[in-house]
Regions:
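Extreme N-terminal starter segment of soluble prokaryotic enzymes
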Residues: 1-3
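A short, glycine/small-residue-rich beta-strand->loop->alpha-helix junction that serves as a flexible
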Residues: 6-15
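Short amphipathic alpha-helix
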Residues: 16-23
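A short beta-strand-loop structural module common to alpha/beta enzyme folds
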Residues: 29-40
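Secretory-pathway luminal glycosyltransferase catalytic domains
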Residues: 40-202, 298, 305
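Leloir-type glycosyltransferase catalytic cores
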Residues: 287-309
Length: 309
């Protein structure tokens, strides 16, 4: 049996949950998760009653005795940031093995990704979020949707480790997408049956934390004023009232993704089922204080965009 120490925000938690599920599937083993309202630090909420509610049968109530047993379990500690193979014979263990780490690479679970998607009912959750926003201007007029994520707030004091991305990164990423979308994707039939190209070809959905609204709205105004985007794009600020996990799902039903140096929008892009999606990620994921090797973090078909000023 396998379990894991849940630590960090939603993006980090998903890496931990997916790595655990994948190891159990691969090893023909069982797994469980400690059902706690917050992560190991006590600072971040967990998502057993929302995004991950379909995994509830795999959770164990966090009674004091269960927590004590959990804390005493033997540990498999992640040894570095790059992908390393997880134990392959866990089904033979008489005592559950506890994974501890971040496991930030889809190499931990890509081979059984669809099976895990089925377990969390990702397709059904996509259908639900599409229905929720089907009448929104965001998805109207035949325009293609692009999710753009800004991460500023908690990075402001730790930029040596997690740099704040400059506006120029987003400008370059948006340029890459609007310049590389096949022209056939920008046409739609009109009333007489002929294909016409619309003036507005892209609806750009802006995602950020409420504390960053002032800076992000300034960036949005700058992008709107850019001659390259002024006539081709409409920009929409996604309201802060939506729960974070719903925002992640909303990112994932857009056609394309421009992510921040954040595992939150990494998953918003990874969950995207559009076979023709373009995902842009920043060249600088960490700052100089963190020497992590990120070669295994990004799928091969994602596009690295220069994020230096």
């Amino acid at each position: 049996m396998i379990t894991v120490l849940i630590n960090g925000g939603l993006g980090n938690q998903l890496f931990q949950v997916f790595a655990t599920l994948a190891t159990a599937i691969r090893n023909e083993d069982t797994c469980y998760f400690m059902h706690m309202p917050r992560d190991a630090t006590g600072k971040r909420t967990t998502y057993w009653k929302s995004l991950l509610h379909n995994l509830m049968p795999l959770t164990v109530i966090s009674t004091p005795s269960n927590v004590q047993r959990f804390m005493r379990l033997p540990v498999h500690q992640e040894t570095g940031f790059r992908y390393t193979k997880l134990p392959s014979k866990t089904a033979m263990n008489s005592t559950p093995l506890k994974l501890v780490g971040y496991f930030q690479s889809d190499k931990y679970f890509a081979d059984v990704r669809d099976e895990i998607y089925a377990k969390i009912q990702l397709i059904e959750q996509h259908d639900g979020i599409k229905t929720m926003f089907q009448d929104s201007a965001w998805f109207s007029g035949g325009a293609m949707t692009i999710a753009m994520h800004f991460r500023i707030g908690d990075y402001a004091q730790i930029q040596d480790a997690h740099p704040i991305l400059p506006l120029e990164y987003y400008r370059r990423a948006l340029h890459h997408i609007v310049s590389n979308v096949p022209s056939a994707d920008l046409y739609k039939p009109n009333d007489d049956g002929n294909d016409v190209i619309t003036d507005v070809k892209f609806n750009v959905l802006i995602f950020n934390q409420a504390c960053d609204d002032e800076v992000v709205l300034e960036h949005m105004r700058a992008l709107k004023a850019d001659p390259e985007f002024a006539k081709r794009c409409r920009f929409y600020k996604v309201p802060d009232m939506f729960e974070d996990w719903k925002q992640m799902l909303l990112m994932s039903v857009c056609a394309h993704n421009i992510i921040a140096n954040s595992t939150f929008s990494w998953w918003g892009a990874y969950f995207n089922q559009n076979p023709g999606k373009m995902v842009c990620y920043p060249s600088a994921w960490f700052g100089p204080a963190l020497k992590h090797d990120t070669r295994d973090l990004f799928p091969a078909d994602w596009v690295k965009i220069n994020s230096l000023i």
